[in-house]
Amino acid sequence: MPGSALLCCLLLLAGVKTSKGHSIRGDNNCTHFPVSQTHMLRELRAAFSQVKTFFQKKDQLDNILLTDSLLQDFKGYLGCQALSEMIKFYLVEVMPQAENHGPEIKEHLNSLGEKLKTLWIQLRRCHRFLPCENKSKAVEQVKNDFNKLQDKGVYKAMNEFDIFINCIEAYVTLKMKN
């Protein structure tokens, strides 16, 4: 019996050491995240600048899709979920529709989408930035308003993409301080 107990302890310690090794590698990715996050946000802004004028000209609506309540969700306890849902919203709903509005912008939108997807993957990889499961009412409101605008919704959403980048930056900056 003492031999099997010793063997169990050794296996347990080996497992703990292995899991700590994985944790350290994961944390190393997170320690460099603030620098890469700044770079990724700069790349997102640069990629968006390639299509911004196109969507500004097409957006003839006076209402705002990305309201202050969304920014408040990003800064509050629902920040994680709001960020995750908004990234998915842009990747799954907005950008595919936006690509159909002009072949001259499709390549730039693909680039913008890839950069947003890369940011999302890195946020998920570093669990402290995206550890969430709750629903954001502000995001639901954005989606409802987007759908009500029908064809014009894509112009509104893409025109306000820079506001979305600012929300991402506010969220990540807040998380880095904590």
Curated annotation (Swiss-Prot):
Name of the protein described by the UniProt record: Interleukin-10
Signal peptide bounds: 1-18
Keywords associated with the record: Cytokine, Disulfide bond, Glycoprotein, Secreted, Signal
Signal as UniProt keyword: yes
Glycosylation sites (chain numbering): 29, 134
PANTHER family in UniProt: INTERLEUKIN-10, INTERLEUKIN-19-RELATED
Function in brief: Major immune regulatory cytokine that acts on many cells of the immune system where it has profound anti-inflammatory functions, limiting excessive tissue disruption caused by inflammation. Mechanistically, IL10 binds to its heterotetrameric receptor comprising IL10RA and IL10RB leading to JAK1 and STAT2-mediated phosphorylation of STAT3. In turn, STAT3 translocates to the nucleus where it drives expression of anti-inflammatory mediators.
Record-linked InterPro entries: 4_helix_cytokine-like_core, IL-10, IL-10/19/20/24/26, IL-10_CS
Biological-process GO terms, alphabetical: branching involved in labyrinthine layer morphogenesis; cellular response to estradiol stimulus; cellular response to hepatocyte growth factor stimulus; cellular response to lipopolysaccharide; chronic inflammatory response to antigenic stimulus; defense response to bacterium; defense response to protozoan; immune response
Organism of provenance: Rattus norvegicus
Disulfide bonds: 30-126, 80-132
UniProt xrefs under PROSITE patterns: INTERLEUKIN_10 (PS00520)
